[in-house]
Amino acid sequence: MSLINKEVSEFSVQAFQDNAFKTVTKADILGKWSVDFTFVCPTELEDLAEKYEDFKSIGCEIYSVSCDSHFVHKAWHDASKTIQKIKYPMLADPTGALARDFDVMIESEGMAERGSFIVNPEGRIVAYEVIAGNVGRNADELFRRVQASQFVASHDDQVCPAKWRPGAETLKPSLDLVGLL
């Protein structure tokens, strides 16, 4: 079953950000572009941390989510120089409720698959990627995908081709285009 256009369910979770605990709810993600990043490894978190200001500059917030507690996130932050670079919220999902809602929970292991989800300002999933646990994700491609999602949201008569970047040509689906690509 596809998650595209699925509305994110109501939630309230504890998070660790800026050396403090806070609560994050569905209301916090509405009105901006959000990227939810489940089951993470340090290299991916660092990649996102290095690109965090770029995401913020296009009105996007990053949330990393794991099935650990917010206390585990703080302990990890305190022990790892890599994790100390993170400025975005690290959401705790110890019950797996968010992982189940995003359909990435591995029940037999009590953990989530690696997934990246782009949620529009209305709270609907517009793009996602779920990959094997032994393959890392790329923040540059995720950033490009957010930009493309933002573009087509405001240009509903156009689509962004592979490798599209802001300012590049888009396509306007039509009968005249069929068979020409």
Functional labels for PLM-detected ranges:
Residues 1-181:
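Chalcogenol-based redox active-site neighborhoods
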